[in-house]
Amino acid sequence: MANYFNTLPLRLQLEQLGVCEFMEQSEFADGISALAGKKVVIVGCGAQGLNQGLNMRDSGLDISYALRADAIAEKRASYKNATENGFKVGTYEELIPTADLVCNLTPDKQHTSVVNAIMPLMKQGSTLAYSHGFNIVEEGMQIRKDITVIMCAPKCPGSEVREEYKRGFGVPTLIAVHPENDPNGFGLDQAKAYAVATGGHKAGVLRSSFVAEVKSDLMGEQTILCGLLQTGSILCFDKMVEKGIDAAYASKLIQYGWETITEALKHGGITNMMDRLNNPSKIEAYELAEELKDIMRPLFQKHQDDIISGEFSRTMMIDWANDDVNLLKWRAATGETNFEKTAPQEAPISEQEYFDNGVLMIAMVKAGVELAFETMTEAGIIEESAYYESLHELPLIANTIARKKLFEMNRVISDTAEYGCYLFDHACKPLLTEFMKKVETNIIGKPFSTSNGVDNTVLIAVNKEIRQHPIEEVGAWLRESMTAMKKIG
């Protein structure tokens, strides 16, 4: 199979990269009707599979799970996930032939073998759904022409899909129809119904393309969403301990600090996050972020270039073929870092203290979010899509670190995201060596300033720069659509 994106002429590459339309609430007035009464069979019952299925069932759809015969016979985790939640479970041969919609929610590396196994069993005119377009775009999977191919891609880990739904909300979602597979023209209606069933319509839905989703998703998760959180966690922890700050305090400040900081980001963008600092700290965080952007920009651009060209996917698929030798080695090494092995203190840290004593973390978030956004839009990805793949998804990933540190983040995200995260981390830490040598505890571990005195002209200029960044402008109106947004409880 050939990389689908690379087979397209430049004109179509740019056209598909640029597909991005924010959908109005009125476009979801039909609810789940396009899928009502149809048999929906989910293949795979991991984090995305189980949690999407729970939401879809609660929304009124007929959901069952098709698993490999050996997974059923051996009562593996996927079988237990489905049966313990009261779902019907059967083999591919038992359930796929009568399915109207088959949702392939297995890990990326299994997609080719899974689709090759289920496609001969799918009935004429049925629909195949993905939540990530890697198999179509990067592997070039060819789907039978009578089958409609759609995507409904929640922009967060599977566990958060369920938690946001239970809170009466949802997570931002991209939907798409594969242009090579929409024989009856009902793909978009089904994709919209899918988004309603998972709750995504309450948080904002972008009509995208398989190409735009893949290229932006890979970029976001490798850089700001996972890669920089890993790099920042390790470097900030080691620096605090080196400078004499109690390791248990440092561990807690970082483990729970990302979540606290990015919750402010979620509700009011970079502006709100920066406004949580006193004026001297805000100016310092701004200047640090500018320096970090200069240092890291070539690395962000390299990741985007390798994603667009297919080089990242090619390299990762070689590791798949080698039984994930690099992925597993890097995962084990992460588990041995001092940050991962140091338990956080039990004493509480106040919400404001996470901001006051985490100026460098805030600077890293600002730099990473803006760089990811800028690099994606320079590559032809539309601003709304770049916003969701950088700023908005970040609090959801930070929440996984709050639960069980980097182990939990890397467990919950896909293997594809995890592999890209390690590539970024391994390149970023050496890049920041000289920068980190200058870091003192006044920007990580202790307050930067107890006074609030600043030069008014400098403060006005900094505030203007923060507020006028394009991600702040697009983010402001996207957040207006999230009327049901609630605080993380």
Swiss-Prot record:
PANTHER family documented for this protein: KETOL-ACID REDUCTOISOMERASE, MITOCHONDRIAL
UniProt-annotated binding residues for Mg(2+) 2: 217, 389, 393
Catalytic activity annotation: (2R)-2,3-dihydroxy-3-methylbutanoate + NADP(+) = (2S)-2-acetolactate + NADPH + H(+); (2R,3R)-2,3-dihydroxy-3-methylpentanoate + NADP(+) = (S)-2-ethyl-2-hydroxy-3-oxobutanoate + NADPH + H(+)
Signal peptide segment: none
Protein's UniProt name: Ketol-acid reductoisomerase (NADP(+))
Ranges of residues in domain KARI C-terminal knotted: 209-344, 345-485
One GO term describing the cellular component: cytosol
Ranges in a coiled coil: none
Organism name: Flavobacterium johnsoniae (strain ATCC 17061 / DSM 2064 / JCM 8514 / BCRC 14874 / CCUG 350202 / NBRC 14942 / NCIMB 11054 / UW101) (Cytophaga johnsonae)
